[in-house]
């Protein structure tokens, strides 16, 4: 073997391999919209919103709650509840096995997390869908956790906010999942009767039984920028009506323009703007007014 091969080429290859292995996985992320390559720690500072094109990337339920609620005083509701395969359902795979796989992938027991806490000092209860858990589909546990959050709002007379991200009802639970549409709608009717605010935040995507029930029953309905919102997907509708749909059909901007939602708020502004809105809806001081009053005192 020549000295050149031993002295130059082999060490060069070894240095290259060491350099490759020293770069942690997941350190870089490509924006699915503009394809910009983004440094993960910097992306976290923008709450997973692309700084180049403002694309709002999908984030998990706990991440949403973490960036929305105050850090102190949180308590999870219904964390002990776990889904059960009562129908012994099987399509290409047993439902029980699908649940096990989803739980292992996400670290969650089901597709909704409910938590009480405070928003800029204001008592509140929040629910958030975990889209990575079987597409955020709504089954018995999702419905029950949502109802427990609403009942907490009723008992404590505090506002409720829900972040929806779902493909709809969970087909593996058949009529049990469809019943959750009525169940969640009924408890929201009680909130309205009691004059307790419910704000629905629609994130990408919201479809099916969730969009046809709780997601569209907010006193105020907010969409994140360019979120997909509808009942059936655009391709299904086009195949049914045999017509080309308008540009941006089912995007939050299209829905706002046609009066289906009330506001579009960027992720970084959700916390302060919803705090002000809820303070006005409940007759409390806004965070700004509270700070001014404290400064004067």
From Swiss-Prot:
A GO molecular-function term, please?
zinc ion binding
The free-text note explaining how the cofactor binds reads: Binds 1 zinc ion per subunit.
Alphabetically ordered keywords of this record: ATP-binding, Cytoplasm, Fatty acid biosynthesis, Fatty acid metabolism, Lipid biosynthesis, Lipid metabolism, Metal-binding, Nucleotide-binding, Transferase, Zinc, Zinc-finger
Q: Which residues bind Zn(2+)?
A: 31, 34, 50, 53
The segment(s) forming the CoA carboxyltransferase N-terminal domain are 27-296
Q: Does the keyword Transcription apply?
A: no
Identify the SUPFAM superfamilies for this entry. Answer: ClpP/crotonase
Q: In the UniProt record, which is one GO cellular component term?
A: acetate CoA-transferase complex
Record's keyword annotation contains Lipid biosynthesis? yes
Among the record's GO biological process terms, what is one? fatty acid biosynthetic process
Q: Where in the cell is it found?
A: Cytoplasm
Q: Which reaction does it catalyse?
A: N(6)-carboxybiotinyl-L-lysyl-[protein] + acetyl-CoA = N(6)-biotinyl-L-lysyl-[protein] + malonyl-CoA
Pathway it belongs to? Lipid metabolism; malonyl-CoA biosynthesis; malonyl-CoA from acetyl-CoA: step 1/1
- Coarse class of the primary localization is cytoplasm
Cofactor(s) essential for the protein: Zn(2+)
Return the NCBIfam families for the record. accD
Would you identify the family this protein belongs to, as annotated? Belongs to the AccD/PCCB family.
Subunit record text: Acetyl-CoA carboxylase is a heterohexamer composed of biotin carboxyl carrier protein (AccB), biotin carboxylase (AccC) and two subunits each of ACCase subunit alpha (AccA) and ACCase subunit beta (AccD).
Q: What does this protein do?
A: Component of the acetyl coenzyme A carboxylase (ACC) complex. Biotin carboxylase (BC) catalyzes the carboxylation of biotin on its carrier protein (BCCP) and then the CO(2) group is transferred by the transcarboxylase to acetyl-CoA to form malonyl-CoA.
Protein's UniProt name:
Acetyl-coenzyme A carboxylase carboxyl transferase subunit beta
User: What is the taxonomic lineage of the source species?
Assistant: Bacteria, Pseudomonadati, Pseudomonadota, Gammaproteobacteria, Pseudomonadales
């Amino acid at each position: 073997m020549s000295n050149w091969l031993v002295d130059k080429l082999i060490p060069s290859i070894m240095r290259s391999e060491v350099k490759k292995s020293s770069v942690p996985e997941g350190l870089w992320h490509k924006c699915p919209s503009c394809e910009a390559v983004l440094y993960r720690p910097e992306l976290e500072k923008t709450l997973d919103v692309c700084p180049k094109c403002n694309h709002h990337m999908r984030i998990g339920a706990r991440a949403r709650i973490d960036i929305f609620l105050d850090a102190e005083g949180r308590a999870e509701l219904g964390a002990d509840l776990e889904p059960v395969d009562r129908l012994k359902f099987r399509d290409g795979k047993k439902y029980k096995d699908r649940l096990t796989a989803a739980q292992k992938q996400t670290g969650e027991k089901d597709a909704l997390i409910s938590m009480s806490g405070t928003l800029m000092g204001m008592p509140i209860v929040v629910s958030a869908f975990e889209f990575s858990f079987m597409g955020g589909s709504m089954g018995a546990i999702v419905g029950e956790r949502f109802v427990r959050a609403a009942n907490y709002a009723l008992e404590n007379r505090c506002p409720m906010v829900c972040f929806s991200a779902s493909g709809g009802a969970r087909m593996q639970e058949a009529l049990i999942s469809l019943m959750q549409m009525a169940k969640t709608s009924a408890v929201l009717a009680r909130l309205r009767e009691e004059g307790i605010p419910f704000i629905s935040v629609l994130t990408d995507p919201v479809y099916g039984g969730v969009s046809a029930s709780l997601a569209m029953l907010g006193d105020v309905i907010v969409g994140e920028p360019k979120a997909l919102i509808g009942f059936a997907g655009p391709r299904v509708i086009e195949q049914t009506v045999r017509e080309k749909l308008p540009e941006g059909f089912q995007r939050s901007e299209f829905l706002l323009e046609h009066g289906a939602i009330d506001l579009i708020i960027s992720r970084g502004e959700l916390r302060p703007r919803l705090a002000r809105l809820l303070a006005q809806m409940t007759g409390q001081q806004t965070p700004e007014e509270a700070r001014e009053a404290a400064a004067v005192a």
